From Swiss-Prot:
Membrane topology (Cytoplasmic): 1-7, 103-118, 182-219
Record organism: Homo sapiens
Region (Disordered): 193-219
Entry protein name: Claudin-20
Membrane topology category: Multi-pass membrane protein
Function: Plays a major role in tight junction-specific obliteration of the intercellular space, through calcium-independent cell-adhesion activity.
Annotated compartments: Cell junction, Tight junction; Cell membrane
Signal sequence range: none
Length: 219
């Protein structure tokens, strides 16, 4: 198993990734308006998230409206919702499992059980990172396609918001953390299997008895 320091580093990366994924899921700025229509004089910026749309006015007021209808949402928004929630669940499960499997903790019992728990936590972290990465990449692709579409008015074009960058960085942190946990278990198990079986040393009395029996065979 990897050293306790390396596992602790991976756990810190995982905690940062979990916090980032949860923050990105709840933030309303997955995309923001590039240019607000000139008729809306009081509006500064309009934000669009997975769960709500918000508008920030020049007066300092900030109003948000929840997206109650699920079927009316675009397919990439529905997919982003599902994959980000899945990433949050998997990363939380990975935190619980990897805590048991860490070398610096006294949970989990014997080394073999801790190794399996560490590997399971790493798989959860990697799966959560992939889920978050799918959400951010797909959502960004739709924003860029809409931005490059010449038929779309300038007022309806958007650019990626801060939540997408947070989600992308968090996905990388979770994936790296999962690789560390999984690699620590893969390196350990083959060494345990390749260890030669220990043989008890033969005493001098046994050697003398064996030699006596061999001499009697020739008499």
């Amino acid at each position: 198993m990897a050293s306790a320091g390396l596992q602790l580093l991976a756990f810190i990366l995982a905690l940062s990734g979990v916090s980032g994924v949860l923050t990105a899921t709840l933030l309303p700025n997955w995309k923001v308006n590039v240019d607000v229509d000139s008729n809306i004089i009081t509006a500064i910026v309009q934000l669009h998230g997975l769960w709500m749309d918000c508008t920030w006015y020049s007066t300092g007021m900030f109003s948000c409206a929840l997206k109650h209808s699920i079927l009316s949402l675009p397919i990439h928004v529905q997919a982003a919702r599902a994959t980000m929630v899945l990433a949050c669940v998997l990363s939380a499960l990975g935190i619980c499992t990897s805590t048991v499997g860490m070398k610096c903790t006294r949970l989990g019992g014997d080394r073999e059980t801790k190794s399996h728990a560490s590997f399971a936590g790493g798989v959860c972290f990697m799966s959560a990172g992939i889920s978050s990465l799918i959400s951010t990449v797909w959502y960004t692709k739709e924003i860029i396609a809409n931005f490059l579409d010449l038929t779309v008015p300038e007022s309806n074009k958007h650019e990626p918001g801060g939540a997408i960058y947070i989600g992308f960085i968090s996905a990388m942190l979770l994936f790296i953390s999962g690789m560390i946990f999984c690699t620590s278990c893969i390196k350990r198990n083959p060494e345990a299997r390749l260890d030669p079986p220990t043989q008890q040393p033969i005493s001098n009395t046994q050697l003398e008895n064996n030699s006596t029996h061999n001499l009697k065979d020739y008499v």
